[in-house]
């Protein structure tokens, strides 16, 4: 485990269902390096949360180049073009959370829309102060811990 605000184990993952299912999530604790940077922007038909756990990287969203710092949170809605670029040097740790939720749950239509507003920002990158970051990371750490039980 890496000493940090967010629990981490290299190569660990948690998966419930698959991307074609209406309810799906996948936590991918891994690392990437400059040597395996993606050549092109890409998209998927599910949501993605990217949390950089190391010092720096660059995220390109719809052609906009954005510098990332440790613990920045990138929120990507489905079909949004993006890619991450990592600088030369040792691999960089990150957590990727991919997920999909059913959109047709009766009574939750308005809640669903408001829950995902942050994913629709022009630059959906969030740099939270430590107190707020803890509120976001605590549930992620609980999932990590419970999945090891």
Task: Kindly give the residue locations of the regions a language model identified.
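A hydrophobic/aromatic-rich effector-binding and dimerization subdomain
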Residues: 1-30, 81-148
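Histidine-centered metal-chelating micro-motifs
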Residues: 56-58, 74, 78-84, 104
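Generic protein-terminus/edge-of-domain signal
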Residues: 1-69, 73, 88
């Amino acid at each position: 485990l890496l000493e940090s605000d967010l629990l981490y184990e290299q190569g660990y993952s948690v998966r419930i269902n698959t991307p074609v299912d209406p309810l799906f999530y996948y936590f991918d604790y891994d690392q990437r390096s400059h040597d395996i940077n993606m050549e092109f922007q890409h998209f998927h038909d599910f949501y993605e949360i990217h949390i950089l756990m190391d010092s720096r990287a660059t995220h390109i969203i719809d052609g906009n180049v954005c510098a990332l710092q440790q613990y920045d949170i990138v929120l990507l809605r489905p079909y949004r073009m993006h890619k991450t670029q990592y600088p030369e040097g040792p691999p960089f740790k990150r957590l990727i959370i991919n997920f999909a939720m059913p959109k047709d749950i009766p009574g939750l239509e308005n809640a669903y829309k408001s829950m995902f507003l942050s994913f629709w920002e022009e630059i959906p990158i969030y740099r939270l102060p430590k107190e707020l970051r803890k509120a976001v990371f605590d549930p992620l750490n609980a999932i990590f811990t419970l999945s090891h039980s």
